[in-house]
């Protein structure tokens, strides 16, 4: 497989040659495009990733063929517009979660697009995660700092000609996503001019009461959001412990409670 991954990020550009963006926060949003290839030996759900001591082999591993940086939003929007037009007017925005380095986020959206056979234009929104398990508080603050940037990125995708914008958020990325959608609702444009498609909330690392308040401000969506939860999610169990033993949305035991908000709750505990 070959996929052009468009990137909007609140990360700082890295000083290391082998790393494009690092875990530091940037006050400005940066833009790029990465041409990714998926090896023929790829298995669904997996990311075949080269270890440091292994030679580069696109036949065995996910591989970044080239990286294009854009000097400003205008240049990025022009390139994005051409891709969206060539892909039937569809775009998918993926927002990663906690403990995710830049390269891991790129690999993950590539795997999602490859395995789902997605036909639109993939857009990665990557906020400044420290990429370490001990950076939970830092990541939480970075996610909060990225809310306005994600809101503007969604508006940019709409301006670039997308007729349908799908969203997949994972873990702590759901906090950024829900805050951006809440801000869109406050501005009177909660569905991006009828362009909002599927909104998938996968294992959301959000306090249940906070989510309820976000949905109350957003309102019942015209098309139900899709929530994937599991009551045996170890990562969310740790998150809940750090938050004072408060239940997280992604492992909430009362999915029928959430369904009243206009959300299809899919319990994957037994899967």
Residue ranges and their predicted role:
Residues 1-69, 74-79, 85, 106, ...:
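Lipolytic serine-hydrolase domain surface
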Residues 84-90:
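Proline/glycine-enriched tight loop/beta-turn segments at coil->beta junctions
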Residues 93-97, 170:
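The conserved beta1-alpha1 loop
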Residues 96, 178, 202:
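Residues lining the SAM
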Residues 100-105:
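Short substrate-entry loop that stabilizes the transition state in hydrolases
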Residues 150, 169-173, 177:
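Gly/Ala-rich beta-loop-alpha elbow adjacent to hydrolase catalytic centers
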